[in-house]
Amino acid sequence: MPQNLPHFYRGRFSVAPMLDWTTRHCRYFHRQFSKHALLYTEMVTAPAIIHAKYDHLDFDLQENPVALQLGGSDPEQLKYCAKLAEERGYHEINLNVGCPSDRVQNGMFGACLMAKADLVADCVEQMQSAVKIPVTVKTRIGIDELDSYEFLCDFIEKVQGKGCQEFIIHARKAWLSGLSPKENREIPPLDYIRVYQLKRDFPHLTIAINGGIKTIEEMKQHLQYVDGVMVGREAYQNPSLLGQIDQALFDPNAPIVTAHEAVESMLPYIEQQLSQGIHLNHIVRHILGAFQNCKGARQWRRYLSENAFKQGAGIEVVETALSFVES
């Protein structure tokens, strides 16, 4: 008889929300590698959902579990969007309190909200009043000169006081001016110890860590101190990493999924999307890194890059590119 698996936190491993990257096509591809990974949408602002001319919440239920990341600071707008997302089948609502870009700040959401903990708490409270699925917060360890551990604890204390039980902490502070979003992911030093300390001081909360995590061994190390790990660019640029996640972090009997297997399992989805008028390039741009460090990877990338954008490009482009790499 198979042994029952231990119960793990839903977000024991997750792929970070990344603007322009974690689209629905990307998430469908990532799901081919892992049954258990929690996948996040790109950040979608509440006003965009409310006023948009097209459907920002569209996704395939086969992508689940998927969390919708919302940007905003109007409690009523966020409440409305959270309810919509739950009705559409999302598994979690996440509030962005970590993005430092100027555009995000001008909209009064993202990392600048760390200085407005009471407002964040009100937003969380309103969203939780409308849904039964978890409402979580993704944030930094500080902003600008507000970077003391006491400041972080005060923020967590106020937000959890209104019911938030799950936080994803990017283990860097954010500079709200002077650095680009890319620089804010690289220049402020990582401080994993501070996130570990947060879990020790708030043991009743669920804490996941994010920032600079690239290997299975690093993930296992972090999971000795926190409840979950979130990986961003490494998962996108080297998606084969995801094929190891289920076995390494959830079920030792789970198979390792190869990039070749994941791409082959994507083919019916690609054909379906093409039949609905989606251009091939919009899908395959997310699978270019599938065979990183594998023989034939360069030919795979080149063939897709040179042919997927062409008018009428079909599934045969992916099948031909796949023939360049070893299974």
Swiss-Prot record:
Cofactors required: FMN
Keyword hit for tRNA-binding: yes
Q: Which GO terms describe its molecular function?
A: flavin adenine dinucleotide binding; FMN binding; tRNA binding; tRNA-dihydrouridine20 synthase activity; tRNA-dihydrouridine20a synthase activity
Q: Where does FMN bind?
A: P17, M18, L19, Q69, K138, H170, N210, G211, G212, G232, R233
Instruction: Supply the EC number(s).
Output: 1.3.1.-, 1.3.1.91
UniProt-annotated catalytic positions: C99 (proton donor)
| Reaction(s) catalysed by this chain's protein | 5,6-dihydrouridine(20) in tRNA + NADP(+) = uridine(20) in tRNA + NADPH + H(+); 5,6-dihydrouridine(20) in tRNA + NAD(+) = uridine(20) in tRNA + NADH + H(+); 5,6-dihydrouridine(20a) in tRNA + NADP(+) = uridine(20a) in tRNA + NADPH + H(+); 5,6-dihydrouridine(20a) in tRNA + NAD(+) = uridine(20a) in tRNA + NADH + H(+)
One Pfam family matching this protein: Dus
Q: Which UniProt keywords apply?
A: Flavoprotein, FMN, NADP, Oxidoreductase, RNA-binding, tRNA processing, tRNA-binding
What is this enzyme's class at the first EC digit?
oxidoreductase
Matching InterPro entries, A to Z?
Answer: Aldolase_TIM, DUS-like_FMN-bd, DUS_fam, DusA, tRNA_hU_synthase_CS
Supply the Gene3D superfamilies for this chain: 1.20.120.1460, Aldolase class I (3.20.20.70)
Provide the site residues for: Interacts with tRNA.
N96, K182, R185, R298, R301
Keyword Oxidoreductase part of the UniProt annotation: yes
Describe its function. Answer: Catalyzes the synthesis of 5,6-dihydrouridine (D), a modified base found in the D-loop of most tRNAs, via the reduction of the C5-C6 double bond in target uridines. Specifically modifies U20 and U20a in tRNAs.
Q: Which NCBIfam families match?
A: PRK11815.1, yjbN
Tell me its family.
Answer: Belongs to the Dus family. DusA subfamily.
- This one is known as tRNA-dihydrouridine(20/20a) synthase
Please report the organism this UniProt entry assigns to the protein: Haemophilus influenzae (strain ATCC 51907 / DSM 11121 / KW20 / Rd)
User: Coding gene?
Assistant: dusA
